[in-house]
């Protein structure tokens, strides 16, 4: 493994900087990413400082919003505030339809995407009396990343978004 993802908040909504520092040090020489627990914190700017000072290499965030598109302004502020101390990675709701806009508005150099699609399991034998979770039937689906989804995302990243007049 090249890296570890972690994220610890105190009940107050502040970053648990002590434990984050301990875990970051234990993870070395691997890189550490503080995950989207950050988006649940009480104050994004203070939390950015805490995560950075605790030794994490990167911060995964949607800007404290349900997805990155809604959080572009906050993510852009975090990128400016980070001033190279820590990498800001945008993550949450990114897809081929919005990635170029998110990259342009935020100036992040790293993104996290979930391109998995639910596909039918090849399992031929099915037991309708047994469910392995609360939602029946999910055991007969699996998550799969389709090559075309990755190509589509790469094309969207390579092509700048159109401006208000439709010009690229």
Segment roles from a protein language model:
Residues 1-5, 55, 129-132:
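Short, basic/glycine-rich phosphate-binding loops at helix/coil junctions
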Residues 4-6, 32-36, 59-61, 86-92, ...:
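Hydrophobic faces of well-ordered beta-strands that scaffold small-molecule active sites
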Residues 8-28, 41-47, 65-81, 97-101, ...:
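Active-site-adjacent beta->alpha loops and helix N-cap segments on the catalytic face
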Residues 14-36, 72-95, 137-160:
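Alpha-helix-loop-beta-strand connector modules within alpha/beta enzyme cores
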Residues 23-26, 30-32, 47-59:
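Compact, aliphatic and Gly/Pro-tolerant "microcore" segments centered on a short helix or tight beta-hairpin
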Residues 39, 89, 108-144, 149:
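Active-site pocket-lining/capping segments in soluble small-molecule metabolic enzymes
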Residues 42-54, 78-80, 88-90, 94-113:
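Catalytic cores of alpha/beta
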Residues 163-168:
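Short, low-complexity, charge-dense intrinsically disordered segments
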